Amino acid sequence: MAKKSIIARNEKRKRLVEKYAAKREELIKAGDYEALRKLPRDSAATRVRSRCTLTGRGRSVYAKFGLCRHMFRKFALEGKLPGVKKASW
């Protein structure tokens, strides 16, 4: 499980992205890169990391389910993910 501080930092970044999204869009359209540069660094969408909703793991996260590969496999084998079954050919 990821440290709580790392998860909290990522949540803060999500809030900042949401807060400055409209302003950032306006500045990009206007081409005002000086004002854009003065916005908080963490308000850029590229700084937000996709994380597993259960464990907080930041790598190998399936966006469609919001789960890391470990939890995805666990729930898929238990039949808790609708429409997901183990491949066999």
Swiss-Prot record:
GO biological process, one term: translation
GO cellular component assignments: cytoplasm; small ribosomal subunit
Keyword flag RNA-binding: yes
Keyword terms: Ribonucleoprotein, Ribosomal protein, RNA-binding, rRNA-binding
GO molecular function: rRNA binding; structural constituent of ribosome
Keyword Oxidoreductase attributed: no
Role summary: Binds 16S rRNA, required for the assembly of 30S particles and may also be responsible for determining the conformation of the 16S rRNA at the A site.
Family: Belongs to the universal ribosomal protein uS14 family.
Subunit structure, interactors included: Part of the 30S ribosomal subunit. Contacts proteins S3 and S10.
Protein name: Small ribosomal subunit protein uS14
Organism: Chlorobium phaeobacteroides (strain DSM 266 / SMG 266 / 2430)
Organism classification: Bacteria, Pseudomonadati, Chlorobiota, Chlorobiia, Chlorobiales
